[in-house]
Amino acid sequence: MLELYFQGPVEGRKEQRQREDRQWTALLDSAKKGAGPLAVRWIDEISEAQSGFLPYLRKRDREAGGNLIEAERLLTLGVRILDALPSEKAPEPSGMPARYLAVFAAEITGNPHAFDAGTKDGKYLEMLVEWYVRRTGTEDGASGGSRGFPAFRKQRLYLKTGLLRDDVSNYALAAGIRARSGSGRIHAGMEGFLEEGEPVQIPLSAIAGWKSASCPENRMYIVENPSVYAVLCGKWDRECGLMCMNGQPRFSSLLLLDLLAESGTEVWYAGDIDPEGLLIAQRLKRYYQGEFHYWHMSAEDYKMCVSAEPVSQRRQKMLEKVEDPELKKTAEALQKSGKAWYQENMLRVYLEIFRREEDRGAEESEHGR
């Protein structure tokens, strides 16, 4: 009766599932035609159910009507993305030209906002980036490099593929940096700023393409406050490196610290002695993979220059997260007085580094005679 009603044989659930499986197999086989090696590997994993992409693709297709048109679009888009990743086009990762995400999106889809945060295709790209990083064996570097700063994990993952999520407001403020490009060539621009004795804002796109970075005497002094940094730069004469975090570290500054650690640079960091400043200092020490010192952030330093600025009880609760043995004593002194301490009060002490660096240079010259 049902066959008469539907004017043909009735398809059961088993037959329907088999038919859909055949359609998906044909769709995946079609997507492989003309795809590059990486994209073919990705499609093979989907076919063999070795990744979470097939359930995701099925879900997206059902949401769009379930006629496989959306599935075909997503597979085609996935192939185009994987074939066009900057990291796949570069001869070596260190020489990889980083691309802005909006430019990449425009080239792939015609829409610079196609992969914006919060969009479905933006989530799809994120899944492809994570798959790529896992399959190319660079996952450890991406996740381990975010220690203390998990918010930057996504940016680091994208950078592994050669994509920059943000650059306009992402720069490192530094003086005394020597750098080499991915090909090993000396970065003439950074060399020029060093010779002129001037600080420079270094964009993320530049740092991402560097193979190495160093500074005079392999000593880098970092401050949190821009006004303190400006005064130090005014007295600076290329005897060391100077850097300004300007509050919470940017991704670009962390990348620069990675390169400095690889070159054996010794870091001295000075921040405000308030709850936020102590936590930033603690995170930076945990992050840096080289020799790291707190610079005038001890309990004794705090007692020398405590201000009249009160710290609210809510902010004082943040001090419970200070676990570093050196900073814990400072946090206890801060909690006891309830007053903050700001870097501007220590300018005279900070400026002593230049006298010490000058004395060190004179002493080394004397020994060299």
Give short role names for the model-derived ranges.
Residues 265, 287-293:
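Structural alpha-beta junctions
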